[in-house]
Amino acid sequence: MFQTTAELRSAFLKYFEDNGHQVVDSSSLVPTNDPTLLFTNAGMNQFKDVFLGMDKRNYTRATTSQRCVRAGGKHNDLDNVGYTARHHTFFEMLGNFSFGDYFKEDAIRFAWTFLTETLKLPKERLCVTIYETDDEAYDLWTQKIGVPAENMIRIGDNKGGAFASDNFWQMGDTGPCGPCSEIFYDHGDHIWGGRPGTPEEDGDRFIEIWNIVFMQYNRQADGEMLPLPKPSVDTGMGIERIAAIMQGVHSNYEIDIFKQLIAKTAEIIGVTDLENKSLRVIADHIRSCAFLIADGVMPSNEGRGYVLRRIIRRAVRHGNKLGANDAFFYKLVPTLISVMGDAAIGLKQTQAIVEKALKAEEEQFARTLERGLVILDGALNSLQGDTLDGDTLFKLYDTYGFPVDLTADVCRERDINVDEAGFESAMAEQRSRAQAAGNFGADYNSQLIIDAETAFSGYTELTGQPNVIALYVDGKAVDTVKAGQDAVVVLDNTPFYAESGGQVGDKGLLTADGVVFTVADTQKFGPATGHQGQLAQGQLVIGQQLTAQVDKKLRHRTQLNHSVTHLLHAALRQVLGSHVSQKGSLVNPERLRFDFAHFEAVKPSELKAVEDLVNTQIRRNHELCTAEMAIDEAKEKGAMALFGEKYDDQVRVVTMGDFSIELCGGTHVGRTGDIGLFKITSENGIAAGVRRIEAVTGIAAMAYIAEQQAMLDEAAQLLKSDSASVVVKLKAQLDKVKQLEKDLSQLKDKLAAAASADMAGDAVEINGVKLLVKQLDGIDPGSLRGLQDELKQKLKSAIIVLGTAKDGKVNLIAGVSNDLTKKVKAGELVAMVAQHVGGKGGGRPDMAQAGGTQPENLAAALALVEPWVNERLS
């Protein structure tokens, strides 16, 4: 009998393969054909275009085990995960599909036969729901399959509108739709709950295990239901639910996959209570996090990356709650790969990347988690009422990186609500402040709405004879532009490239007889192109013909930098891994800047490998080929689409040999050899999970290398060495400096000891206690600690306060022998003195330090020590 999750997966796919279905691999968790979806959340997602008639496959029957994530957006199960028996962020959906092949009778028969004959589920434990008016399905279930009428349940429009029902599926407001049949399993009367359609249906006794959707209508905009010419079938069965039934347990968290993950988590953290809900949360979250990273999503502050970050941080918080002191989450990946079997092949290939990304994110969050929890705990302990205010929510989010749902999770455990509306208000205020701070002047051009279209000829031409079709001055449409005025000129066609995809807009000239307009920038305004600049001489009018001339040198240098970003992107993916994806770029004539997803600093050896790889491709002198094609065709060819970019149905594909293929509308060199040379100038992090490389090409790269060589030569001269020996000579000098610093420190200690011998005699006695207060002008502040220690040893039982002023700053130290700390505390004493010199400080009862900014008040401040001590000793 099939019992393990892996056995069930294999049995399902084999059953449908034996019945003429094509086994199709699970698609990525990042949807490639549906921009409306955050994550793949159903088996039919990858077949959406097939159902819509926009795509054709070489098969009409398919079966899959699809990885799915529901966290964020419309389908968000995150809040319930760990607290219920069946909510997950990650799950596998078993499914079979018919694209105009079989319909209701076969779909029903396939499902029933698999459940009752292959899995041998008791028929009396199964009941079926159908849409209220779907008599065809009712007859098939009762007459063909033999389900008793008492186990058939009709469900009507129970969601407030026509065809708004649990048993009527719709892709959207219009398009394919149809009734569905759901098969439920009865876990037994020892569990509370009622059959579907009853008031107790939300209980856990009757659990839906299989949904069979009959796509038989095409819903029109006016609501009319027209029959589809080729009805189709979409089914889904959660593998975790059927595994629970086959393994004789009620909760999904008791099945083999979760039992092993929970046990491993408990072992790593050192927990003995395996029923703890935090273990369930962690076991669920490692699945979604690991598979999302394997599919190219990296933790970030936006979009899919932010949802991933929220899930990781929720898991880390629950680990902290269980007592985890060190990074633990990433250590679950090997166990996950083991328990997922064939479903983890892609995860196994990216295991190292997944573990590094999880560890980096966990360690980063751990640094602020403890402090944030202290703030939250304090706020909850002092809370008046049962709702945490929005300002505190915002502070935790803004300062400590606590997603709102993580804070809500903590509050939920204490039966406390959260003021999400107040949080959103605080967020809105911050956005307004940021916008106001950045708004140094009105940008009228950004507000332009231009009802015109400009054709682009700049891929092949840098000159043209366009006509003026619109003029704007100070954001307003005008008929004429006069000399000296700044303006936006709109042409019917142009060789000027408008800023897009990270490439800056072209510069150049628009001229005619007696007319010179200097183009300082070129921008898009919808389908129109605006040439921004100043009219140097003459007059511009609508309808006027001009000569457009792009600055050839600037365009050429920009093209070098744009083409090399494609090579850089491909090289980074080869050296660092396929998880690397572009997050932003800037390409101008001087340099290029490339932002990309990666979880740690790039090692010098990796940077060198990337640079060498790019220069190798430059030397190979690949021809740059461009082609227009359908976006789906481009993706099939392996073209990289940049996340966040919007593409038309027809796209431009730029290919460089067999090394790089990307969707790109920018301008490029003819061959990679034109780039000449590529040199990385810097690499650094700009956000969690996002790195930035800056680089130069061509003549700029040669100039950079010459500049570096000049600095090396100068350093060699200073070290009286040749360039090749600079590192060795510099290391020797640094070693010498370290030794001198050590000698100096020892000398200071000796001087402090000698000085302490002289000063010890200056101590006064107050109520039987020795007190020494000294202002030491000119002494190095770093020597105060050693001097104070020496004086303590000599005076044995004493109170010591030393102060020095240097470079406009005051440094103070107070020392109290241990036998006196119950009466006089060094921290309180030094804080009292510091407040009189414009500073503050504190420390332990026996030793404390402080600083100040008013050296002119130091003597008077030290004079206050004796009466202060006298008061505490009396």
Swiss-Prot record:
Its EC number is 6.1.1.7. Zn(2+) binds at H562, H566, C664, H668. GO terms for molecular function: alanine-tRNA ligase activity; aminoacyl-tRNA deacylase activity; ATP binding; tRNA binding; zinc ion binding. Pfam families: DHHA1, tRNA-synt_2c, tRNA_SAD. Its main location: cytoplasm. Binds 1 zinc ion per subunit. It is an enzyme of class 6 (ligase). Its cofactor is Zn(2+). It catalyses: tRNA(Ala) + L-alanine + ATP = L-alanyl-tRNA(Ala) + AMP + diphosphate. Signal peptide: none annotated. One of its GO terms (cellular component) is cytosol. Keywords: Aminoacyl-tRNA synthetase, ATP-binding, Cytoplasm, Ligase, Metal-binding, Nucleotide-binding, Protein biosynthesis, RNA-binding, tRNA-binding, Zinc. GO terms for biological process: alanyl-tRNA aminoacylation; negative regulation of DNA-templated transcription. The keyword ATP-binding applies. CDD domains: AlaRS_core (cd00673). InterPro entries: aa-tRNA-synth_II/BPL/LPL, Ala-tRNA-lgiase_IIc, Ala-tRNA-ligase_IIc_anticod-bd, Ala-tRNA-synth_IIc_core, Ala-tRNA-synth_IIc_N, Ala-tRNA_ligase, Ala_tRNA_ligase_euk/bac, DHHA1_dom. Belongs to the class-II aminoacyl-tRNA synthetase family. Catalyzes the attachment of alanine to tRNA(Ala) in a two-step reaction: alanine is first activated by ATP to form Ala-AMP and then transferred to the acceptor end of tRNA(Ala). Also edits incorrectly charged Ser-tRNA(Ala) and Gly-tRNA(Ala) via its editing domain. Consists of three domains; the N-terminal catalytic domain, the editing domain and the C-terminal C-Ala domain. The editing domain removes incorrectly charged amino acids, while the C-Ala domain, along with tRNA(Ala), serves as a bridge to cooperatively bring together the editing and aminoacylation centers thus stimulating deacylation of misacylated tRNAs. NCBIfam families: alaS. This is Alanine--tRNA ligase. It comes from Shewanella frigidimarina (strain NCIMB 400).
